């Protein structure tokens, strides 16, 4: 099925080197389907409404590799009702291209001391009411409570599906949405840039 949904020879850009992948040399790419979860990046809350827009004809799927600062982007176009993979681009993250936030996030998830200094006091916390699963509970957490509640966050790479939402380099807010694959996991992390740099100011856990 994947070969049928791929345009061959497939343009593949390895940094500055343009290549072509013939159908006979294509290896099945699982993207993030073998992962436990995938992530999405947004600048604004309203942009999250773009997910699932059935009118879209173009979507890019990205892997952002935190250690190497590499970005692998898959370009999909919808033609005659079918999504087709039209190109893949592997390149270094450009200066300013979410680089500031990615640099912060990489340290935030790996350095607990740094993390504690970049959490809003108090931290807004939204979750499902344990006494009523149909109600949302809005409360706050202090740093110690955050460490008790915090989930495992991706540390090696982030995925992103670009539905047309803006990911501006100069945006002073970023939203990281982590969706589980077939397990009901759903966490959203809200970051903003203040005088001391980026901070986590809201955490939402609506996992089922």
Where are these predicted regions, by residue range?
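Hydrophobic, well-ordered secondary-structure segments
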Residues: 12-14, 124-135, 195-200
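Intrinsically disordered, low-complexity N-terminal regions enriched in serine/proline/glycine
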Residues: 11, 73-74, 113, 124, ...
């Amino acid at each position: 099925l994947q070969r049928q949904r791929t345009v061959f020879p497939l343009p593949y850009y390895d940094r500055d080197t343009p290549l072509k992948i013939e159908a006979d040399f294509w290896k099945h790419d699982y993207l993030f389907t073998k992962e436990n979860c995938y992530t999405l990046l947004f600048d604004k809350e309203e942009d999250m409404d773009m997910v699932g827009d059935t009118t879209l004809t173009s979507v890019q799927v990205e892997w952002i590799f935190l250690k190497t600062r590499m970005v692998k982007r898959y370009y999909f176009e919808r033609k005659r009702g079918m999504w087709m993979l039209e190109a893949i681009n592997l390149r270094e993250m450009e200066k300013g291209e979410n680089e500031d936030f990615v640099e912060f996030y990489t340290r935030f998830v790996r350095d607990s001391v740094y993390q504690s200094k970049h959490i809003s006091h108090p931290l807004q916390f939204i979750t499902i009411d344990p006494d009523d699963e149909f109600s949302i509970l809005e409360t706050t957490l202090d740093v110690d409570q955050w460490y008790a509640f915090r989930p495992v966050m991706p540390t090696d790479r982030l995925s992103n599906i670009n539905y047309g939402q803006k990911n501006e380099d100069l945006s002073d807010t970023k939203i990281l949405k982590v969706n589980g694959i077939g397990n009901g996991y759903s966490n959203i992390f809200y970051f903003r840039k203040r005088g001391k740099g980026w901070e986590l100011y809201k955490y939402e856990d609506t996992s089922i």
